[in-house]
Amino acid sequence: MAISPVLFIGLIYLAGGGSLFPGVEAIWLTVPESGERCVYEEIQANVVVVLDYICIDDAFTQLGPTLDVRVTSPYGKELYKIANVTHGQAAFTTSESGTFLACLAMHHDQSHHSVNSSVIVSLDWKMGIRAKDWDSVAKKEKIEGVELEIRRSTEYASAIRANILYLRIREAYMREINEKTNTRVNQLGLMSLGVAIVVSISQVLYLKRYFLKKKLI
């Protein structure tokens, strides 16, 4: 039995806990002394997101680097902003689908100036099932063992269904865009052909009149 591409991608998406790269737990990146580094993630609407970050002072100096961190929505709304920190956690629930941006920069002011020329940062996006604190759920609802695993598996199954439906909607949307684009290209092609035919006929008639006037034919 063949597995459709949509189902295959959905299963990979679930296996990664909301990411298309299941083996990646965190992103390691270098933030320069000036400017900022941004990381983006495509996230659906109504998804719980937890972003953990920590900067590493590889020089082990007392004046270690600190960060300015901000997270923005697809429409540019600031969901999280903090300055002069070495680590932290941003948590929010998405209200729209799209590209969410996390930007980091080294903090500089008169009271704190790092001797580092750059800083290494560990950045970990957790979404949906991965963002859920199952230990807290187990304590709050007093469930453990097999019952907890069944609860977790049920939510994973619901996530699979939601992700597959989302991917199917995106697939249908992209197919509609492609069909509209193809239709417009065909229309423009026919218009161009019509214009070329009209111009060619006009040129032939003009040349015919010219040759008749000059009595060349």
Swiss-Prot record:
Write down the SMART domains for this protein, in alphabetical order: EMP24_GP25L (SM01190)
Predominant location category: endoplasmic reticulum
Q: Which residues are on the Cytoplasmic side of the membrane?
A: 208-217
| Motif residue range(s): COPI vesicle coat-binding | 210-217
Its GO CC terms are: endoplasmic reticulum membrane
Outcome of residue 210 to F?
Does not affect the subcellular location
Establish whether keyword Protein transport is in the entry.
yes
The membrane spanning regions, by residue number, are 187-207
Pfam families named in the record? EMP24_GP25L
| Superkingdom classification of source | Eukaryota
- The residues forming a coiled coil are 138-160
Where the record places motif COPII vesicle coat-binding is 210-211
Q: List Omega-N-methylated arginine occurrences by residue.
A: 170, 175
Q: Which residues are glycosylated?
A: 84, 116
Q: What does this protein do?
A: Involved in vesicular protein trafficking. Mainly functions in the early secretory pathway. Thought to act as cargo receptor at the lumenal side for incorporation of secretory cargo molecules into transport vesicles and to be involved in vesicle coat formation at the cytoplasmic side.
Assembly and partners are described as:
Probably oligomerizes with other members of the EMP24/GP25L family. Associates with the COPI vesicle coat (coatomer). Associates with the COPII vesicle coat (coatomer).
Record's protein name? Transmembrane emp24 domain-containing protein p24delta6
* Annotated organism of origin: Arabidopsis thaliana
